[in-house]
Amino acid sequence: MSKMNKKLSALFLALVLVLGMTACGGKATDGTTGSTDNTVTAEEEDHKTQNTKVDPNSPITEDMLRNHAVAPAEDFTYDVEDDGIKIRSYTGSDTVVVIPEEIEGKPVTGFYDYVFANDNPVRAVLIPESVKELEQVFTNNESVELVICEGVTIFRGLTFGDCSNLRQVILGENVQELVGIGTFTNCCRLMELHFTDALTSIDDEENFYGCDNLTIYGPADSYIESFAKEYEIPFVVE
């Protein structure tokens, strides 16, 4: 990406460093989120599958993640909101995490910042299609390798920023925007991303800063093709 800006501003570097050192905050229960104080430690709920062991020395494949056990509700703390469940933290021990589609009979619709960030040891996460936006969920996580997030339409700054071991992000067909900066910044092992005509806005080329091994795939004559060519990111028509 020789034409891409090869340096971040001092402000952006400071922001990444600060965010990389920020803790998840555990089971916070204050009312600063704009919703009523419904934070709970998830009670045990019925689930049909049990966790299976994953070899820590072997890469995790898409099939492995898709076929893995759904995490039980008690592995999370969360807020019960009018339109669904917003997850605050992951407290389980499994490093491969399939987020449940529902908790307490309500759809999982979002995450607070840093749920899987920093030193969280998760290696792979499958996010249900009921989640439409992500922001700073995985920031500065050096363990995560694979994320499936096929329902997300909007990514906000630093969703995957500084995830240096991230190899694969499987997107859905309806990604519309990369808002702000740093969505995939310094994901140096990320090999490919697939976008469709639904993508119409990328706020800044630094969303792909440091992605030196990345190839972007997308439709001919699309917004993403024009963007990739402008900033000399390898692009393949599909």
Please describe what each predicted stretch is.
Residues K86-I87:
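Conserved functional micro-motifs across diverse proteins
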